[in-house]
Each structure stands twice: as structure tokens, then as C-alpha cells.
């Protein structure tokens, strides 16, 4: 965490930038003056300038260096020179970063700094109180208080960000992160590589990737199926495509299988040797060599398996944040949703709803796809064709609401072909694809055409 002086200096820099934009950009002025209050300013000069700008605006007077200086003199504020206003105007006009970065970005930064400062002050006071009476307070209670305040600060920061409205043009044109910039980069990526995955990742299945974008950054993706149909196999196969073929960083949180079991499935997938043969050790020299080669392949990849994951939602959320921060993962897989416990204990339906909302929020917050496996209710077993529907998602309709993409896997017991149905796609079309599935090696592949 930054020191308090570093936070204050950063806040004063942001105040300076915002007042400069208010001075030269009329479309920014009203918004900035409406969103801020004078007590939020750290620098007394900036606070006085803000008060004067607001007075001039409220009285229909132009906001210029001269008009602001005259009002400051009228209020007998003499601890600041007119040249400070002139420098503010000059920097706002000549600094490319100040001109290109939207005022809403600066406002967001200011709210984050404010939350960071409040949290820093709280931690400082809490440790002082604990050091004065170490025997009267539990260190675990202190940590719990800090954790609660941290969660509150994060929630407050994001609520402030989401509460601020932004014009359509601002969102469209904003510097390097606006909609126009993203569309141009997508076009450049498509022209260069003939694919549409600038801000998304291919699943590795051409038929699916040609029809729609599944693993877009920020997407909350659900893979749902009946037991023993291939949910975990599809997730592992997709993760291998990402980590090995595409050289992406992948996090896999398994609440059901051990790390060793997952790695054996990965080895079976890469070598084409059945999981049963690997378990028995019934391998030829050539097969053992293939296993060793697969080991070298995965050694070069960034595939992180967390099989000792706690079942509590808050601990899983912390683990995901840590994987993103420390290991810079691009995609997270969770196996599976119904094994997670939430502190909302009124009933299981409310628990699942809380879990779904939290994972959806994490995908958006961390700007990565989070793929979560889910069970289906027994209703699908009662239907003759056993084709899954959105209403079959187990325990909560909230999953259907929160998910950006929902994939269903359907396979007849006697068939080696699986139908992958996109039952929901918030940002694209729904469709179906058929893949070949080899359960012995947990591998999905395109169906070979017979000519």
C-alpha cells in the first residue's frame, strides 16, 4: 500500500488536472463541478479555486484565469499568485495526457485514492490501538476488522464509479480505451490474423470460434451438463488449448479433484494414452517417452492448478484475485459452482445467487473470463430427449441472469459425439456445434468429415 504522503500527492495532482480541464473544456466543467465537493480537496489552493469556479458557473459568469483571479481577490484570498492559474491553464492546453484522458478517468482515480487514504488511516489507527493493549485484543479480530473495512472500501469505490454517468460520445471516443479505439484494434487484429480475438480468447474449437466469441474479457461463462457427460473434461481440454497451444496463463480451481488427478487427465489428453492405462502403469517404453515429452510441454506452460481451494466464497474470491495479481492469469476455470459455500445461509437458492453474483462481479472487476462449471437439476432427466434448457440450471435462476454465456453439453450414452449448445450469449448469437469426445483421454475435437 502507498504511504499517506504518496496518496496525498497523487490526489493533489488529480485535483490540479481536473481543475485544468474545467478551465478549458466547457463540456467537462459542469460535470466536474457537479461531481465534487469543496471538502474533498487536499490542497487549499485547489479548494479555493474550485469554490470560485462553482460560484462563477452558478452565476452564469465565464470561467477564465482573469475572472477566477478577480473573484479570489474579492474574497481576500491572497496566499496564491495569479501565475498559478496561468500555469494551470498552460498545462491543460499543452499536456497531451491531460487533453486525451477523460475527466471521468481522473474522477475515478480520485475516488480510488480517497478510499485508499481512508483504509490506510483505519489500518494505522487499528494497529496503534492493538499495540497499546495487545493482551486485550485478538490479532485475528484485528485482521477480520481490516478485512471488513477493505471489502467496504472496494465496494464503495466501485459503487462510486458505477454511479457516475458518462456521455455516449465520451465512452465512444475516450483515448486508448474507448469503444472506437477497441473497434479499430479488433479490425487490425482481424486483418492481420484473420481472427476476431483482440479482446477475447479462442476456445480452440474452430466450429465454435467461427460462430461466436465465448471467452471475452470480463465474461462470466457457465458450462452445464448432466453428471458424467463431460463438464470437467471440456474445461480441462479448453484450458489446455489456452495454456499450451495459445501460451496463455490459466488458473484452474478444482473443488472436486486433486491436483494429481487433473494432471493425469492433462497427460492423457496430450499423449493420447488412456487415463486407465496411466493409472495401471501398463505403458510401453514408447508410451512412457510420450508421457515424459508431455511433461516437457507443460513445463513451458503457465497452467496453475489450485486443488486445495477452500469451499468458502470469500476465500475463493481472494484466491482468484491473487492468481490475477501474482500470476497474471488470463482465464480462470472453477470446478464447480455447487460445491462453493456462501455466508448467505438463508437457503441454498440464496447462496447460489450470491455465489453467481460474486463471480460475475469478479470477472468484470479483473477483466478476465471466469468459466464456472455447473450442475443441472433433475428435471432434464425426466425429459425423453434429455436436451438441457436454461431453466434446468440447478438451485437458482440467478445463474441464468448473471452469466454472459451459458454452454450446455449433451451426449447420448452410446454416442461419441457431443452437442455443445450456446443457450445464452449476452453479446452474440446462440448456436450449436457438434464435437467428437473421447472420454478415455478427456479430449474434444472436430468431427472428421468423410468424403
UniProtKB/Swiss-Prot annotation:
Q: Does the keyword Ion transport apply?
A: no
- Which residues are the signal sequence here? none
Q: What is the effect of changing residue 267 to V?
A: In plasmid pCTT1
Catalytic activity entry = Couples ATP hydrolysis with the unwinding of duplex DNA at the replication fork by translocating in the 5'-3' direction. This creates two antiparallel DNA single strands (ssDNA). The leading ssDNA polymer is the template for DNA polymerase III holoenzyme which synthesizes a continuous strand; ATP + H2O = ADP + phosphate + H(+)
Protein name in the entry: Probable plasmid replicative DNA helicase
User: What mutagenesis or variant effect is reported for residue 188 to V?
Assistant: In plasmid pCHL1
Q: Which organism is it from?
A: Chlamydia trachomatis
Give any Gene Ontology cellular component: primosome complex
Amino acid at each position: 500500500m502507498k504511504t499517506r504522503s504518496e496518496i496525498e500527492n497523487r490526489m493533489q495532482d488529480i485535483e490540479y488536472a481536473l481543475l485544468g480541464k474545467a478551465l478549458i473544456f466547457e463540456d467537462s466543467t459542469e460535470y466536474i463541478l457537479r461531481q465534487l465537493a469543496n471538502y474533498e480537496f487536499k490542497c487549499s489552493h485547489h479548494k479555493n479555486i474550485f469554490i470560485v469556479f462553482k460560484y462563477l458557473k452558478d452565476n452564469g459568469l465565464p470561467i477564465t484565469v482573469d475572472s477566477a483571479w478577480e473573484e479570489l481577490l474579492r474574497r481576500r484570498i491572497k496566499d496564491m499568485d495569479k501565475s498559478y492559474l496561468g500555469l494551470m491553464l498552460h498545462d491543460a492546453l499543452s499536456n497531451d495526457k491531460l487533453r486525451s484522458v477523460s475527466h471521468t478517468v481522473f474522477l475515478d482515480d480520485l475516488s480510488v485514492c480517497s478510499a485508499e487514504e481512508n483504509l490506510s488511516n483505519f489500518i494505522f489507527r487499528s494497529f496503534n490501538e492493538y499495540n497499546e493493549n495487545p493482551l486485550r485484543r485478538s490479532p485475528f479480530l484485528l485482521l477480520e476488522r481490516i478485512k471488513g473495512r477493505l471489502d467496504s472500501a472496494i465496494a464503495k469505490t466501485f459503487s462510486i464509479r458505477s454511479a457516475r454517468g458518462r456521455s455516449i460520445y465520451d465512452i465512444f471516443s475516450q483515448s486508448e480505451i474507448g469503444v472506437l479505439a477497441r473497434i479499430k484494434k479488433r479490425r487490425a487484429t482481424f486483418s492481420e490474423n484473420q481472427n476476431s480475438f483482440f479482446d477475447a480468447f479462442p476456445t480452440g474449437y474452430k466450429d465454435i470460434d467461427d460462430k461466436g466469441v465465448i471467452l471475452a474479457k470480463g465474461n462470466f461463462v457457465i458450462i452445464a451438463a448432466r453428471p458424467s457427460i463431460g463438464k470437467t473434461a471440456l474445461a480441462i481440454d479448453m484450458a489446455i488449448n489456452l495454456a499450451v497451444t495459445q501460451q496463455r496463463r490459466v488458473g484452474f480451481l478444482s473443488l472436486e479433484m486433486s491436483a494429481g488427478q487433473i494432471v493425469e487427465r492433462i497427460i492423457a489428453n496430450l499423449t493420447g494414452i488412456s487415463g486407465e492405462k496411466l493409472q495401471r502403469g501398463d505403458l510401453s517404453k514408447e508410451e512412457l517417452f510420450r508421457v515424459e515429452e508431455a511433461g516437457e510441454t507443460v513445463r513451458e506452460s503457465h497452467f496453475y492448478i489450485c486443488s486445495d481451494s477452500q469451499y468458502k466464497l470469500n476465500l475463493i474470491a481472494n484466491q482468484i484475485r491473487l492468481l490475477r495479481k501474482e500470476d497474471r492469469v488470463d482465464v480462470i476455470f472453477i470446478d464447480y459452482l455447487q460445491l462453493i459455500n456462501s455466508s448467505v445461509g438463508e437457503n441454498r437458492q440464496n447462496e447460489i445467487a450470491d455465489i453467481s453474483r460474486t463471480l460475475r462481479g469478479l470477472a468484470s472487476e479483473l477483466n478476465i473470463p471466469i468459466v464456472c462449471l455447473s450442475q443441472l437439476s433433475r428435471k432434464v432427466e425426466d425429459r425423453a430427449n434429455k436436451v438441457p434448457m436454461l431453466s434446468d440450471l440447478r438451485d437458482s435462476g440467478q445463474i441464468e441472469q448473471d452469466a454472459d454465456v451459458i454452454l450446455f453439453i449433451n451426449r447420448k450414452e452410446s454416442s461419441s459425439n457431443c452437442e455443445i449448445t450456446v443457450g445464452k450469449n449476452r453479446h452474440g448469437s446462440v448456436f450449436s456445434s457438434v464435437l467428437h469426445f473421447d472420454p478415455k483421454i478427456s479430449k474434444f475435437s472436430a468431427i472428421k468429415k468423410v468424403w
